[in-house]
């Protein structure tokens, strides 16, 4: 907008220069006075230089009413704002503010308590828009004003041509008459009346006067000055040049207005694009923030719901298990009672029939009783076997949990009571009896924490690895010096990264054992350690024994569990 105004001012200055140049043609030249010669000083006398003037006294600081009012207003604003802010922190000050009913205290306190930087920015933008939203003339208004100026300029040119042409046509002067006519003509006194026709000035309509730019107003003013100069001058012989200059000025003004309109439209489009981009970026930012907040809330609610559902599900599962076990035991008891009742009822009916039939069909009754006894024995055997299965399964599960995966906080417990319980139950099955017989010497004297876990075996193997490295470097029949040298050189061995399947050196064996233990393949690790030879095999013998003991216990417990399922 500033560029458009400066350009329009330059255009108006050019138009005014044309009008002023036309006026200067009738102005008489100024008389320049001759230069005055400088005074001549006499050579014989010397005048002393005057003393320097005294320094001016310091000016007293004038009283400024505007500064006094500004400082007073600023101090009152700070005191008032500080009082309202203190009212939000102190109840006594709040009571004072409410009692005195300070102006706008409710709105300002609400703004201090609930206001934010975004609200202040929004209020500042609204205030800024009120001052910056100035109504500018549209393109249609500018085009309409340009057309009116062109038509008005054409009318002025036509009227100027008419008035200039009318000055040429007049009465014949005395020189146009013949000498005889001049002698015969009497002396006449003619009163000369000079009628000066004034050209119409350019005026704007009242509805366009408010929306027209200041540059256009200055241009119209220069046009009016030019018309007045035409009225005051007698430039009849230079009408063509004047008309040409007017036409060129009007054309330049029209082209300038068109260029200004285009520049204004382009700048407006650029500002609209920039504002649209800023709004889109702010909208995208707000959308991302809302999405992140919603996702965070969703994940939190999801975790809470999952925890509640898992807790509820575990409680329901435990309750269902207890209900199912109780229902099963009740069903078995009810079946036994029902069978006993049916049996007694059947026996009583048969006895009554025999009594009524005088002990007739005694053999049929005996056969029926035998069948009932077989059925009762088979049903009882099935119930006993199912009970044994359940007891064996519980005992094996308990042994596995105690031996193979003991809890760190549990106290050591003896294993013999569980073995005795299995021995009592498995008297009828040969496979179970043999498995329990082989398992008894392994864990009879052991506790729940004496069998090493995979993690403990891995830790012991890592502690044993330096000794194995030093032992692998011992020469045959090594003495004290050989042992010391092997210890020193074992420190220089670099650990092997990865697993070498075909490596027979001690580092490859150590790496394969550690990898197998990390994967839970204890049998492969024990096999690798058992294949060691020499002094290394003797050092690893205790570890191999513990690993084999764990493998044997795992195998026997798995065998007992599998056999209990097929009883």
Swiss-Prot record:
Residues 31-59 are annotated as: Disordered. Residues 32-58 have a biased composition (Pro residues). Residues 88-567 are mitochondrial intermembrane. It is a single-pass membrane protein. Residues 26-64 are mitochondrial matrix. Keywords: Coiled coil, Membrane, Mitochondrion, Mitochondrion inner membrane, Transit peptide, Transmembrane, Transmembrane helix. It is found in: Mitochondrion inner membrane. It holds the Pfam family Mitofilin. Residues 284-383 form a coiled coil. GO terms for cellular component: MICOS complex; plasma membrane. The chain crosses the membrane at residues 65-87. Residues 1-25 form a transit peptide. The keyword Transmembrane helix applies. The keyword Aminoacyl-tRNA synthetase does not apply. One of its GO terms (biological process) is cristae formation. Belongs to the MICOS complex subunit Mic60 family. PANTHER family: MICOS COMPLEX SUBUNIT MIC60, MITOFILIN. Component of the MICOS complex, a large protein complex of the mitochondrial inner membrane that plays crucial roles in the maintenance of crista junctions, inner membrane architecture, and formation of contact sites to the outer membrane. Plays a role in keeping cristae membranes connected to the inner boundary membrane. Also promotes protein import via the mitochondrial intermembrane space assembly (MIA) pathway. Component of the mitochondrial contact site and cristae organizing system (MICOS) complex. This is MICOS complex subunit MIC60.
């Amino acid at each position: 907008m500033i560029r458009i105004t400066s350009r329009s001012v330059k255009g108006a200055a050019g138009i005014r220069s044309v009008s002023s140049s036309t006026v200067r043609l009738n102005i008489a030249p100024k008389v320049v006075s001759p230069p005055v010669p400088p005074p001549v000083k006499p050579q014989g006398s010397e005048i002393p230089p005057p003393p320097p003037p005294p320094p001016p006294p310091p000016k007293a600081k004038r009283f400024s009413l505007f500064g006094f009012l500004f400082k007073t207003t600023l101090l009152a604003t700070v005191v008032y704002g500080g009082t309202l802010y203190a009212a939000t922190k102190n109840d006594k000050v709040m009571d004072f503010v409410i009692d005195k009913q300070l102006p706008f205290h409710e709105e300002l306190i609400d703004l201090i308590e609930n206001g934010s930087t975004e609200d202040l920015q929004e209020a500042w933008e609204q205030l800024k828009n009120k001052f910056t939203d100035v109504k500018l003339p549209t393109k249609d208004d500018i085009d309409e004003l340009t057309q009116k100026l062109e038509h008005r300029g054409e009318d002025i040119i036509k009227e100027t041509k008419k008035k200039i042409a009318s000055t040429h046509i007049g009465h014949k002067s005395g020189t146009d008459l013949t000498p005889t006519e001049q002698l015969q003509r009497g002396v006449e006194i003619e009163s000369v009346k000079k009628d000066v026709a004034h050209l119409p000035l350019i005026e704007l309509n009242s509805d366009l006067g408010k929306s027209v730019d200041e540059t256009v107003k200055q241009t119209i003013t220069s046009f009016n000055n030019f018309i007045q100069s035409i009225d005051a001058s007698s430039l009849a012989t230079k009408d063509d040049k004047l008309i040409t200059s007017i036409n060129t000025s009007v054309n330049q003004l029209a082209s300038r207005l068109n260029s200004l309109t285009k520049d204004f439209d382009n700048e407006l489009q650029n500002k609209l694009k920039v504002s649209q981009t800023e709004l889109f970026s702010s909208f995208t930012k707000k959308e991302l923030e809302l999405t992140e907040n919603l996702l965070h809330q969703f994940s939190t609610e999801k975790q809470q719901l999952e925890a509640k559902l898992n807790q509820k599900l575990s409680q329901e599962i435990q309750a269902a298990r207890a209900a199912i076990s109780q229902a099963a035991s009740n069903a078995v008891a009810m079946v036994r009672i029902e069978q006993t009742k049916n049996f007694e009822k059947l026996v009583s009916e048969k006895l009554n029939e025999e009594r009524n039939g005088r002990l007739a069909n005694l053999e049929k009754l005996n056969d029926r009783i035998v069948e009932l006894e077989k059925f009762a024995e088979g049903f009882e055997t099935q119930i006993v076997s199912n009970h044994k299965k359940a007891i064996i399964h519980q005992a094996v599960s308990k042994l596995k949990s105690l031996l193979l995966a003991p809890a760190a906080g549990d106290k050591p417990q003896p294993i013999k009571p569980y073995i005795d319980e299995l021995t009592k139950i498995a008297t009828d099955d040969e496979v179970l009896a043999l498995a329990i017989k082989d398992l008894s010497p392994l864990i009879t004297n052991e506790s729940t924490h004496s069998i090493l876990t995979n993690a403990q075996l891995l830790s012991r193997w890592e502690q044993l690895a330096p000794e194995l490295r030093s032992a692998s470097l011992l020469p045959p029949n090594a003495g004290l010096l050989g042992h010391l040298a092997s210890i020193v050189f074992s420190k220089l061995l670099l650990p092997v990264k990865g697993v070498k399947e075909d490596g027979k050196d001690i580092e490859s064996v150590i790496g394969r054992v550690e990898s197998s233990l990390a994967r839970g393949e204890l049998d492969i690790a024990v096999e690798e350690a058992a294949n060691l030879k020499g002094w290394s095999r003797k050092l690893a013998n205790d570890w191999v024994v513990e690993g084999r003991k764990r493998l044997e216990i795992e195998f026997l417990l798995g065998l007992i569990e599998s056999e209990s399922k097929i009883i």
